[in-house]
Swiss-Prot record:
InterPro entries registered for this protein in UniProt: Pra-immunoreactive, RDD
GO cellular component: plasma membrane
Encoding gene per record: yckC
UniProt key word Cell membrane: yes
Domain of life: Bacteria
TM spans (from-to): 14-34, 45-65, 91-111
Provenance organism: Bacillus subtilis (strain 168)
Protein's cellular compartments: Cell membrane
Principal location listed in the UniProt entry: membrane
Keyword annotations of the record: Cell membrane, Membrane, Transmembrane, Transmembrane helix
Membrane topology recorded in Swiss-Prot or TrEMBL: Multi-pass membrane protein
Protein name: Uncharacterized protein YckC
Length: 151
């Protein structure tokens, strides 16, 4: 496994905040304007954000809007594009782990990203992914270069 250009904590946090501002806040506001109900109690909003988090990276080469703006993306640990199963593991299963551990899993992720050279968090380890600065196709070029160097 060759982790190429891993993205650290601050850039990932920035991307998550951008996603919240660009995706969640408008959804919450629209929901509130249309229904007049508290959007924090809405399963609809949760479902839309969940589908966004799982499906968009599959169709947009590992990018979510915030990650795209920050120039980072999610890839499998071999550098290939994420799949439905990968994103399911990353979002749903890891989310359950974070809930079941009452946030201790999140603390573990913060420690992992700080101490691991590859910057992989708990949800990355569960899903077999990492977050990289590499653009689509760049990992393949790097892998080819590594092969040539070893010959």
């Amino acid at each position: 496994m060759n982790i190429y250009k891993p993205a650290g904590f601050w850039i990932r946090l920035g991307a998550a905040l951008l996603d919240y501002i660009i995706v969640s806040v408008p959804l919450l506001l629209i929901y509130w304007l249309i229904t007049g109900k508290d959007p924090n109690d809405s399963m609809f909003i949760s479902l839309v954000v969940l589908l966004y988090s799982i499906l968009l990276p599959m169709f947009w080469r590992g990018y979510l809007i915030g990650k795209r703006i920050c120039g980072i993306r999610i890839v499998k640990k071999d550098g290939s594009q994420v799949s439905l199963l990968t994103m399911f593991l990353r979002v749903i299963v890891a989310g359950l782990v974070y809930c079941i551990t009452f946030g201790l899993g999140l603390i573990a992720s913060l420690i992992l990203i700080a101490v691991r050279e590859d910057k992989r968090t708990l949800h990355d380890l569960i899903a077999g992914t990492y977050v990289t600065y590499a653009t689509p196709g760049e990992e393949e070029l790097n892998a080819d270069e590594e092969i040539r160097k070893s010959e």
